[in-house]
Regions:
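Cysteine-dependent deubiquitinase/ubiquitin-like isopeptidase catalytic cores across multiple families
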Residues: 1-238, 243-273
Length: 273
């Protein structure tokens, strides 16, 4: 790898701040996923757009990093050529692919909006080289890692960030790891699993099973936070313009409350602005 940055920590507040600095809109944020059991997803605003995973590297990861499909015409993918840049690359993988699928709209003239235009037509290798030479993203990474609460190590780091996004077609989970040649496609545990459950199943099968006694796993979910804002126990109020119709707004709250009769949306008692 050409040079080295200091590692990021798996802190949802810091990564949300970082993503907004780069150009993600303020209505999208990261949330901790506290378990790989299904109940943990009930604590996170839905629908979940993408996941980040920080995991400990195992002895066979050197061989595994050569995997991945080089064919990724419908996915924004880049290689990692800067040591410890995995957190930034995982974040960019999530952001760029959500924008590619029109699931989010970047802040106009933001870093990531300009980057998205600059890397069009480049293959994953050239995108990685482009990123490794870009001083603006290096400075942004350095700025956010200095705000972390963890003790920063200058030695060898044995944890790694990757991203997961949903497939455009079917219930396949797509893993994006900058060490690999391209995306990795994971079949879900069952065909009926929604994206969130399918990702947790992949994390259990493909990652935790290799280091079952290691506690250095962190899972972060990226989603709009309207379902939390709209929830009756929230002290916040929702914004005037939501990026989905009122029927979807009801659906989010029904899922959040699991049909509770006390839900203010279900009873029509929507808090005023």
């Amino acid at each position: 790898m050409t040079n080295s940055w200091l590692p990021l920590e798996a802190n949802p507040e810091l990564l949300t701040e970082y993503s907004r600095t780069l150009g993600l809109p303020a209505d999208v944020r990261f949330h901790d996923v506290l378990s790989v059991d299904a109940w943990a997803l009930e604590m996170v605003p839905n629908p979940i757009q993408a996941f980040l995973l920080l995991f400990p590297l195992s002895a066979d990861d050197t061989a595994c990093c050569k995997g991945g499909s080089a064919k990724c015409t419908d996915i924004v993918f880049m290689r990692q050529f800067v040591e410890n840049a995995c957190g930034t690359i995982a974040l960019l993988h999530a952001m760029l692919n959500l924008h590619e699928r029109r699931m989010v709209t970047f802040v106009q003239d933001s870093y990531v909006a300009r980057m998205y235009d600059s890397i069009q037509g480049l293959d994953p290798e050239k995108r990685g080289v482009w990123l490794s030479k870009d001083a603006e993203i290096a400075n942004a990474h350095a700025s956010i890692e200095s705000e972390g609460q963890s003790v920063v190590s200058n030695g060898e780091v044995d944890t790694h960030f990757i991203a997961f996004i949903p497939s455009r077609d079917g219930p396949v989970v797509i893993e994006l790891d900058g060490r690999k040649n391209g995306p990795v496609y994971h079949a879900p545990g069952t065909e009926s699993d929604p994206f969130g459950l399918a990702v947790l199943d992949v994390i259990k099968r493909e990652f935790i099973s290799k280091n079952p006694n290691d506690i250095r796993f962190s899972i972060l979910a990226l989603s709009y936070h309207y379902s939390t804002i709209l929830h009756p126990i929230s002290p916040q109020v929702y914004p005037n313009d939501l990026p989905f119709p009122i029927t979807e707004k009801f659906s989010l709250l029904c899922n959040r409350c699991l049909g509770s009769r006390s839900c203010k949306i279900l009873t029509g008692k929507i808090p005023k602005h």
